[in-house]
Amino acid sequence: MREITPPLPAGDLIDSPRLMLRDGTVASVRASTPADRDAIRRFFHDLSPESLRNRFFTSSQPSASVIDRMSDSTDPAQALTLIVHRLLSDDLRPVAIASYMAVNSRVAEVAFAVGDVFQRRGVSTALLERLAVSASRQGFQRFQASTFADNHAMLEVFRDSGFEIRSKTDAGVVELQLSLTMSPEGVRSSEERDRIASAASLAPMLTPSAVAVIGVSRESAGLGRRVFDALRAGGFKGPIYPVNPLAADIDGVPCLPSARELPPGTDLAVIAVPAPLVLAAVDDCAAAGVKSLVVISAGFAEAGDTGRALQHTLVERVRNHGMRMVGPNCMGVLNATANVRMNASFSPVVPAPGRVSLLSQSGALGIAIIELARERQVGLSTFVSVGNKADVSGNDLLQYWERDPDTDVILLYLESFGNPRRFARLARRIARSKPIVAVKAGRTTAGVRAAGSHTAALAASDVAVNALFQQSGVIRADTIDEMFDIAACLESQPLPAGARVAIVTNAGGPGILAVDACVAAGLQMADFSPATTARLQAFLPPEANIGNPVDMIASAGPDEYRRTVEAVLTADEVDALIVIYTPVDRRTSAETHAAIAQGIGAGRRAGSVGKPVLSCVIAEPGARAPMLVDYPSAFDPDLVVHERVPSYGFPENAARALGRVTAYAAWRAQPPALYWTFDDLRVDEARDLCRAVVDARGGTWLTGEETRRVLNAFGLPLLPTVLARTADDAAALASMFG
């Protein structure tokens, strides 16, 4: 057994045609073909003499044989050339070319050339990582490279790459040897570069300086008009430009006849025109320098083969222009933070600002989710309806939210995974600092079919999804409502240090329900110490149950609630508290609520600031609104803490939410897993078998024999196993084993 380096981010993206640049723009990347000869020749012809010299050690153009070799990537065991393309003056051209060519079976020579305008954008670094992953898969162990000693930019790429490097300088030329195994520090640097580029690409979309809406009609019911009206009503801080060639103005705001006339600095354009007109709108936006798009229009991959082909063309066009796109077939994006206040969607509801960010793959559900957030008083930071996820996906948004100062909790409504391996790697890292709560729809066969027709989603096995979430630290919620139950706890309460929970109630029935739900959720009922028991006995009536749950009985008034909550919250043997209140006399409800808040505040002042508190108010209007608790800080008496205690309509909801949060806290407390391997594993054999099963039968269970072969490939010892098809067969076979 030996520890190995975790995989490079480029390994998750090796087949992706999108290349992220450091400045937040994107480009297309693919392996060369013989049809690229003329484009490659033209690329080198347009390079400056200095760039040619740095690539070929001469300012002369490369020979035809060199061009031919770069144009042939049919056998990556011999050579591979990656070409980066962008649309320049409506012409798709190479802007960077990187190659490796075999020296022998273990060593390949690597070289790069980047167009002068695209240098210093991280292109060479990204291409080096992709080439390294591809070369490793072909059995290469090292790259070798040569560069002039004064080519500081290229030397910086190699030295900052994270690969182990040996170098020597002779006559002004540096000869380098790069191991294709990256150090853990190098992997972390690579992940950070990937995160920075992804976040930079989404900043113009989520924090734009100005927004255009393409397809704003005079009719108030049109989607473009609804987005335009929502932007104005939401209080967006920057200019809003409606685009309509047939209208002079919309509600007094002058219209532009074409997106090509948008002024500089228009970061985001929302496109709401019929699907056949979207490509032209994209080209117009690119000509005006727009950096990001939200395509609300439907009629793409969710609409059949013709729409799927149109979506493929759309994504290529957007990528070749260097832009990012949400959608198509989405409801828009929203940023509720005070300094942005952008509702670039057709949601009629603007949520209160908060610290929860949300992704929804369904537009219609997105509207309901925003309304539920308002009802539950869970404030949102950003909301993105990704629709068909043709470009921007949940993985991109996770990296944006990872360091977003306005996001503490991440919520996901998913119908599919585009790249589950990448999701697992990102979620495992991000969940260490910010909780991720997900609802994954399509749990049944019928649900999978519905998801596919709804947003062109490719659903995954529910068993696989559970395993993915558990390993990645993602909190899975079964319903949207449960997702908000969990979010309400996470956004306002500390993570528990353990699973010991105490329950305070004034009615036995709800207390019993709470106990059952807590145990089912994996929580432990705290055993009160003699000190805690004595403290409760000092003021509670003899009829009260001093155990856990603490049943103060129906006659308990505000004072009993205040003192009991404080006593239990400050008990060392308690990690979390659920307070249940069943209004027996509504005339004292307000006073009792205040007393519970006072008890929580007293417990906080006494030092119990690290314990989550959840409340449950039964059969009372507004029961799910958070309880507001104000108290002087335990660290600074002049500072008043304003705490929101989540409230639930039934004890089971509170218990389930606390159980999910406690399990997440336990996962987060564990040290990050190390990557281990064994030299005698036959991973390729197991992988090939599983792929053959998927190709033959789709996502399904392995047979007994297939399972045995997979486990055997991983060196796991198996007991003798036989298959019984009837109860009598099982009894007969069991007798054979004693």
Annotate each predicted stretch with a short phrase.
Residues 2-204:
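Long, contiguous binding/interaction regions
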